[in-house]
């Protein structure tokens, strides 16, 4: 794979790469790039997470030395799973099991736990230095990386440490690339801004889109919201299970949820069914989506790219229900091996049951 092919693979289906010029320069230097994705083991794994998981696969395929940070302490600070660290750790193992079922090559992925970082005094030295070089106002604004608003900094002081910890995660691992959803942008930009002051690498930030919830963006009262708050309002969320498809949902439930999802005829903007196709189904190269329909409605068709799918949908040549049913079939094909892995292990079945009974946000 040459440099142009690597850049195309790394940048496809991303919202932004900061910056592509820096990425190209690093690749041209022929250095072995180190990247990471960090995630909070905060509960049930929904299909929105498969977007960054697919990009993780792309980066590994492009030859980037990737690690994944199981951010257990971060989840505790963020009050996930009641702050129960043991339950959070189990949720981390569950998420790694999902990634393996999704086809992530775990032999090429280094797994790092927050415990590996926080036991090192040099890590906390970095946290203090990052905090020292960041204003209180900016630290509060960065709380959106936790799925919180700036005013929630008043909940407890540990919330203010969180952004400095995330920046330190990057510096401590001496990374070239930080992968995350667009909701992680403020942490990554903070890392880039502070890097020079601390004589650290200016990390390349790769941001994947957030999958809109099944309700779409058109049914929500979002007028006047800032972009971060708007995205937080419409995104698929495990705390709003009616808006989400979970990886353990039965095939019948997946189909039912998609049949009831927002997908107006010819409308692309904030359309969850189209987004699932763009970022998850067509996230892999060489995929075909088969639309099954009666001959009186045009007969079966095979769609070989997302661009083709979007075009015929806009032109009104594809009925929303036909698209929903085809999407359900293809999505279930993707979820099937994941469901089998999770359902075969009682500790994860019990975890899912426990979380479903106590979803708070």
From Swiss-Prot:
EC number(s) on file: 6.1.1.1
A biological process from GO: tyrosyl-tRNA aminoacylation
Keyword Translocase on entry: no
A cellular component annotation (GO) from this entry: cytoplasm
Single GO term (MF): ATP binding
Chain location of the short sequence motif 'KMSKS' region per the record: 235-239
Stretches assigned to coiled coil: none
Pfam family, one: tRNA-synt_1b
Keywords: Aminoacyl-tRNA synthetase, ATP-binding, Cytoplasm, Ligase, Nucleotide-binding, Protein biosynthesis
Sites where the protein binds ATP: 238
Xref: HAMAP family: Tyr_tRNA_synth_type4
UniProt name for this protein: Tyrosine--tRNA ligase
Annotated source species: Sulfolobus acidocaldarius (strain ATCC 33909 / DSM 639 / JCM 8929 / NBRC 15157 / NCIMB 11770)
Gene name in the database record: tyrS
């Amino acid at each position: 794979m040459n440099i142009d092919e690597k850049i195309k693979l790394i940048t496809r289906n991303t919202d932004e790469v900061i910056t592509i010029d820096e990425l190209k320069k690093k690749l041209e230097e022929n250095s072995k790039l180190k990247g990471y994705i960090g995630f909070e083991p905060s509960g049930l794994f929904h299909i929105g997470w498969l977007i960054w998981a697919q990009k993780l696969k792309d980066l590994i395929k492009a030859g980037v030395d990737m690690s994944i940070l199981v951010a257990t302490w971060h989840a505790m600070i963020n009050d996930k799973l009641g702050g129960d660290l043991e339950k959070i750790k189990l949720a981390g193992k569950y998420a790694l099991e999902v990634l393996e079922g999704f086809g992530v090559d775990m032999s090429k992925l280094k797994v790092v736990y927050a415990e590996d970082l926080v036991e090192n005094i040099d890590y906390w030295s970095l946290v203090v230095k990052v905090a020292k070089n960041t204003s209180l106002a900016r630290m509060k604004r960065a709380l959106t990386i936790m799925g919180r608003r700036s005013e929630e900094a008043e909940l407890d002081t540990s919330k203010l440490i969180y952004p400095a910890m995330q920046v330190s995660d990057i510096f401590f691992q001496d990374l070239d690339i930080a992968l995350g959803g667009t909701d992680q942008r403020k942490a990554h930009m903070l890392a880039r801004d502070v890097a020079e002051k601390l004589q650290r690498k200016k990390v390349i930030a790769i941001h994947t889109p957030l999958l809109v919830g099944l309700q779409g963006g058109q049914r929500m009262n979002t007028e006047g919201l800032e972009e971060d708050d708007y995205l937080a309002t419409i995104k698929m969320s495990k705390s709003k299970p009616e808006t989400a498809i979970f990886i353990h949902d039965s095939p019948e439930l997946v189909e039912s949820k998609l049949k009831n999802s927002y997908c107006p005829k010819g409308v692309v903007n904030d359309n969850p069914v189209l987004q699932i196709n763009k970022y998850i189904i067509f996230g892999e190269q060489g995929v075909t989506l088969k639309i099954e329909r009666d001959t009186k409605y045009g007969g079966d068709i095979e769609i070989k790219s997302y661009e083709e799918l979007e075009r015929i949908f806009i032109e009104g040549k594809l009925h929303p229900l036909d698209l929903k049913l085809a999407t359900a079939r293809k999505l279930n094909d993707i979820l099937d091996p994941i469901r089998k892995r999770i359902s075969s292990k009682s500790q994860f079945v019990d975890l899912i049951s426990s979380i479903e009974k106590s979803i708070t946000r």
